[in-house]
Amino acid sequence: MKPIYVPKGKAKEYGDYAINIYTGCPHRCYYCFAPNVLRRDKEKFHSCIQPRDGIVEATRTQIERENINNKLIHLCFTCDPYPRGYDSTPTREIIKIIKESGNHVQILTKNGVDASRDFDLLNENDWFGITYAGYARDEFLESPFSEPHADSPYGRLTALLSAHNKGINTWVSAEPVLNAYDVIDCIEFADYVDLWKIGKLNYHPSDIDWKRFGKMAEIALKAKGTQYYIKESLRAEMDGERKEATL
């Protein structure tokens, strides 16, 4: 098994290398694409979560054999590196291997509480990121309706602030955007975010005016002087004809 791979398609917009550590994810986000990509039964994907067999040693072996060095490796695409309610020791061990071999990690999670336990392994060459789709006020302190078993938005942002205070690069994946107004508010007030990556909701209905939202988000990001990347599908909406919808 070669767990480290080069992402293809839309995933290439996130990084040059990636590892998917677990066989599933318990967070049950309604927009999750992973079961379809992996051709897995959706219920089994969300209920049968374990580290892929031998993945820790396979990661070490691949890095040594292929002399992978000074690369940014993304954790993860088809799972969360910190599945809430499960042991994330394999993630910690893989981060150790990546760092000891002279590489760097880019983490994306919806579980800030567990992820913060590994901040002692990260430094100024690494990136810690959370998914922030935009949420209603009554969802801020608990698992959102759209991500029923994930950490609360508050927990994620708190972890992001902690990472920032420790000198770790921070980023937010606002993809998919579910609440446009809240995402823009977060852009304006979260001064501890070093990079935003923003994309639209795909394969599900939405009444968001993507052209208007994209332009408003870009204006806010430029005003803050924050690094950002607009995903291709959202950029296409911004550059195309306006669709009848509401922000």
Q: PLM features: what roles do these ranges have?
A:
Residues 54-223:
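Conserved AdoMet/S-adenosylmethionine-binding subsite of the radical SAM
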